[in-house]
A protein has these predicted regions:
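Cell-wall glycan-active module
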Residues: 1-177, 269-340
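Generic recognition of stable, solvent-exposed alpha-helical segments in well-folded globular domains
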Residues: 165, 169, 182, 252-255, ...
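Short, functionally critical alpha-helical segments immediately adjacent to catalytic or ligand/cofactor-binding
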Residues: 168-196
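Generic recognition of flexible, low-complexity loop/linker segments
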Residues: 170-173, 246, 369-370
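Generic helix-packing signal
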Residues: 178, 264-265, 388
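Catalytic and binding regions of secreted/periplasmic enzymes and modules that target cell-wall glycans
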Residues: 190, 197-325
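Beta-rich interaction/scaffold domains
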Residues: 331-399
């Protein structure tokens, strides 16, 4: 169970301290609730110096932020290239049914104030390796109940006895490249699923048999490859197998885990994307809004919750440092997740009048028309049909 909150008479002093650090008022209640349970935790504002709406708009570029196809319709975008108005379907942008996220859900997941709870806050935890606080025992807690727990696998003689456990490989890989092994485990579970059923680590892909990609590095849909195939193409060495960076070809799980960890350490953590949040929403450095590890808009929050499982209450009693982004011109309160569902298609497939002519000619994206009729006209009939057969049309008839 969680510890009892700190006495409320500390509240005013702590809020004053947070204000002095530069946290906006809208952050304070969530941070106080966390501090009252975990007084050793340290919260630091990470000032992006980026306008809030600018950042959200940059992440709203088609293809940068995706949601699963079964998400509520209000979570899915209808911008150009995201939705097929003719057949009322969202366009798949990545293998597995991933479609463009709506601006509203992007804003929700980008708003740090929505994730100031004892599990999701771990997306703001610094990702560096710390031998004193990151233990094999806690890693075992994180992976328990998943395919990573107590599992041995054939490493093709990359270790002295030819077998290893996922947990041990993740731990030593993290220690060797300077990244928290807890982060690596959370990433692998997020990318491969808790049951490990992803074809990325099966070794049996039809086009790239015998190759593995433990973190889905370079895995995205192209005209030639599915996302899994593109990731395995990268694992194989890419064009003609010529790529040898990061220990490629990854023809064993051992190589895929260690090589992928080294890739992540060099290209993300060392580049300043040293929290799960910044890995997903890169609002720092010279390559802002690019070099983002995933397109899943909920990825940072999801991995943060997975990461939190590694921290027992005893470990949470120690000092942990969280770097929490602050934007310029943020909304006064946290952006809620949209809740609406149903077809967004309110367009017409036809609009006709019995007398005169519409100006301009009917097109489904035009919302206003002018109608000029002869002076002697007494009545007109308006007829319209919806593009979505399940929709109804109001306002037709005789006038």
């Amino acid at each position: 169970s969680e510890p009892e909150p700190t006495a409320a008479n500390d509240r005013d002093a702590y809020l004053t301290q947070l204000r002095a650090l530069g946290f906006p008022e809208s952050y304070l209640e969530g941070l106080w609730q966390l501090h009252s349970r975990y007084p050793a935790w340290e919260f630091r504002p990470f000032f992006t110096n980026v306008d809030w709406n600018t950042a959200v708009n940059e992440e709203n570029v088609l293809g940068k932020s995706l949601v699963w196809g079964s998400a509520p319709s209000s979570w899915k975008s209808t911008q150009e290239g995201a939705f097929n108005w003719t057949d009322n379907t969202w366009i798949e942008l990545d293998s597995g049914g991933w479609v463009a996220a709506s601006r509203e859900i992007i804003a929700h997941y980008m708003d740090p104030r929505n994730f100031l709870d004892s599990s999701a806050v771990f997306q703001f935890l610094y990702q560096g390796y710390d031998a004193a606080s990151q233990t094999r025992e806690s890693l075992a807690v994180l992976v328990s109940g998943t395919f990573l727990a107590d599992t041995t696998y054939d490493t093709d003689l990359d270790t002295s006895n030819g077998v290893n456990t996922y947990a041990e490989t993740l731990y030593t890989a993290g220690a060797d490249c300077g990244v928290s092994p807890y982060i690596l485990a959370a990433m692998m579970l997020q990318e491969m699923g808790t049951n490990g059923a992803s074809e990325s680590i099966s070794g049996t892909n039809r086009r790239f048999p015998g190759y593995y990609n433990a973190f889905n590095i370079g895995a995205y849909k192209t005209a030639e490859y599915s996302a899994v195939e593109r990731g395995l193409w990268y694992a194989s060495g890419g064009h003609n197998g010529s790529g040898t960076s990061w220990g490629r070809p990854w023809n064993s799980l051992y190589k895929a885990i260690r090589g992928g960890a080294a890739f992540y350490a060099a290209n993300y953590v060392a580049a300043g994307q040293n929290t799960l949040y910044l890995k997903r929403f890169n609002v720092q450095g010279e390559n802002m809004y690019w070099n983002q590890y995933m397109t899943n808009v909920a990825g940072a929050a999801s991995e943060g919750r997975l990461l939190s499982y590694a921290y027992s209450e005893e470990m949470r009693a120690s000092k942990l440092t969280f770097n929490i982004p602050v934007y310029l011109n943020m909304p006064e309160s946290a952006v809620p997740a949209p809740t609406g569902d149903g077809s967004p298609n309110t367009k017409l497939s036809s609009l006709t009048v019995s007398t005169g002519a519409l100006s301009p000619e009917f097109r489904r994206d035009i919302r206003e028309y002018t109608l000029i009729v002869p002076n002697e006209t007494e009545r007109i009939t308006v007829t319209a049909s919806p593009l979505n057969a399940a929709a109804s049309v109001a306002g037709t008839g005789e006038y």
